[in-house]
Amino acid sequence: MRILEYVGLDTSRVTAQYQKLVDALGRDDFRAAEVKKLVNVSHGKLYRAKLDYANRLLFCLVRHETEMCALMLEVIENHDYGHSRFLRGAAIDESRVVAIEAAAAGAEAQSVRYLHPQRTAIHVLDKPISFDDAQEAIYRQPPPLIVVGSAGSGKTALTLEKLKHIEGEVLYVTQSAYLARNARDLYYAGGFEHETQEASFLSYREFIESIRVPQGREAAWRDFRGWFERQRQAFRDLDAHQAFEEIRGVIAACVGGVLSRSAYQALGVRQSIFAPEQRQALYDLFERYRAWLPETGLYDLNLIAQEWASLAAARYDFVVVDEVQDLTAVQLALVLKTLIAPGQFLLCGDSNQIVHPNFFSWSQVKSLFWREPALAQRQQLRVLTANFRNADVTAQLANTLLKIKQQRFGSVDRESNFLIQAGGGEPGRVQLLSDKESATRELDARTRGSTQAAVLVLRDEDKSEARKHFATPLVFSVHEAKGLEYESIVLYRFVSDHRSEFAEIVAGVAETDLLLDTLEYRRARDKGDKSLEIYKFFINALYVAMTRAVRNLYLVEADTQHPLFRLLKLTLSEQAAIETHQASLEDWQKEARKLELQGKQEQASAIRNTILKHTPPPWPVLDERGLRESLTRVFREQVPGDKQKRRLFDYAACHDEPMLAQHLDREADFSPARGFAQQRASLANKYLTPYQARHFKDILRQCDLHGLEHRTAMNHTPLMAAAIAGNVALVEALIERGADRDASDHYGRNALHGALLAAFADGKFARSPFPALYELIAPASVDVKVAGRLVRIDRHLSEYFLLQTLWALFKSRFTHADRRPYCAFETATILQAWQHLPPSVVRAERNRRAHLSGVLARNEIDRDYPYNRALFARVTQGWYQFNPALEIRCRDADQSAWRPVLAALNLPLIHEFALEHSLPRIESYLAAAGLPSCAVPVALERRRAQQQRAAQRQSESHEPRWGTPQARQREMQKLQQRIDALRKSET
């Protein structure tokens, strides 16, 4: 087999042994190499080969078409699997690994779409990647750099690999939050670490928030459309879509500031969609729009970018802007303003994919750099023409569409003047079908049960008609489909519902004009022709929609004789040739979660409502509402019987609430609570037993019935319960189905916090299975708001694990008698909690008092430190608590909101079960955070009332003598109380 090497492989200490081993693997002699399969690794098929007595080589197998290759990943020195990057904390017992032959291992090889015929250097993100010659040249090109490439050209993977070589503070920013999150996960996949780099992966909105968090919510197209309908009477001659593009892409997008009315009126013919005589009305609409935004709690990112320009400071050593065509000029200028050194950037995108209203052009982007001649001379542009996503026939169809676009409108710019080259190797299928009931019925029957087939329409308002014919929940407009890909795509009435626009697009284009294999740069014949700007959306939307299909594309049209189809060489098919895989409930669960993460809540909800059809669990859940109801019934109303008391006692055991058990004993006369310390472990285990089992089909069946995020009786999700139980296999199964790592209980604790508490209490749990759990369930980052701006704490920062530790232990500061009176944290407390954690979770240099004290001190409020995140407040010397002014972003499905940190941790509920000496400290923390004070805990109400009555009787028994000043004052108080009571009764 062919030998490949990971670009980061270091064999310098074992050169001779390595060469001998490679020779054996090259001739498929796994026995000589002593190859064994690592059986308990969940992320891929990994093997180890013996270099010598102490050292091992980690590798995997990949297959390209019929060629089998061994990819050398990492040298494991001295059997130290715990420090392996690629094993990510998995515990390896060499006595349990099994020998394997080359043929058996080859059957499990990972398939790759492309492999360079000569080069053996392989990059690794979430999978092995081999660069073609164009990608390799860009990889070695210094900045500044602009990379132009079609969908599936590998732009993102290439930019991430280039980013790995940059030191300092770096930024990756793109319009889509999902793409930013996915890029971050790809970047750190395989355990990648960069000690001298701090990387931020942000959507553009999050980038804006990192400067200052705007008030309200971003205004979307749907918001504008609804508002525009109410203005239509005054603006009958304006089209909503064109008006939105003009406001977003022209008036509000200028780098020098929002265009004045006169400046807008003076724009050239090609600089605006609208004719000069229409611009007065359009500017009137813009002024109304600008006034409407704050009235409804909305904001426009362009207008915010204009305002925030004065706040942006030079911060980043390097910036990557992905999908740059989705940004306006002012948005891009704001990003580049945060560079410390001009020119340290990489921009990548494809102007043929523009479906957002922004009036983008590469020439406009480059004009930002021409203001600095030295930078303009250095700036280089490279084009990636290969497409590794789409089938050959789809790529050919997309190329024909690009030829039509160029013939009709001329070249958009020099940078976008290229055709794509299919590199995926799939032949694929494209069919044109008539919009008749028989054809749509057949397509619907084949697609409705598959997660690999989606229906696309041009605009949001077209989806309702498509849903009359297709029952799949996967119906998207083009704006929504950006960034998606499915094996089969159905385009519904793209052309038929817009006959005139597409007729105008193909006007004057002949079949002979499309015979060229390349695009020659040429400008439009008429410089005053604005057709491209008017019709750009339609042709780009069709291009984007086509390229969402990985293998099969079906165009369903009423007008199958439209001249566009003749130019595309599409002939009518009588029957759809489509084969789809019928998805399981597990497949639909994963699809729903993926769409939620991408912000496609409409389609995710449709999956849950029409396919998954989850029902609420039949058991009562002790969430905060249920808990407070039980407290009221037991302690305030004193309802007879032990049922509610037993529920509260079980709750105390599961959530470690010793004071609640004490209240049940003393205030509710529940005698079993006296043995709380002895019974707690067994009672808590009762609720975890189903989640500890090796066979957990019943748990997965419950998830099918009630949803992945249903709650147990103790208000845990299945993922939380599995993590606390330490069941790695169940956690993997739930994560694979799309379980939400961020879901939290009524104390703001997620699955990671539950597992942390188990690891802190049990050294065996900390050593195994916690390292594997941590890799699976730790959220990628935590978003906090400090001094009005977003601060993202990534999982690779020291502050991340410290914050998660304090979050998990927060409640115990107030509820356990062995804690100090400050209700805060010191380094000794944290180090004690971490004492059993392996280096794969907390690196050895971070698990030291000096380092920990430094992290706490440098993140203290008002500390003069450049990267101070102001996470903590010092209570007294050496004792810290969360900064009370801190806010945290709490996510619920597709919604997110900022909450004060003490509210997110639910300090008011903690107050109900806190030690009595902790109550004043809780009140002071709440006051510092600007939160309301708490009433007397429900369990203590009767005792406090008794104490007050006793105090009153004591006071009355020592009444002052009649005639003394004290007696007169007392009588005046009584008289005033009677007057107040009388007035209250009269009102």
Residue ranges of each PLM-predicted region?
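Conserved helicase motor core of SF1/SF2 NTP-dependent helicases
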Residues: P128, P144-E169, Q175-G216, Q278, ...
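ATP-hydrolysis module of ASCE/P-loop NTPase motor domains
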Residues: V213-Q278
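Ankyrin repeat domain, specifically the short helix-to-loop turn at the C-terminus of the second helix
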Residues: I699-G707, E732-D740, P769-S781
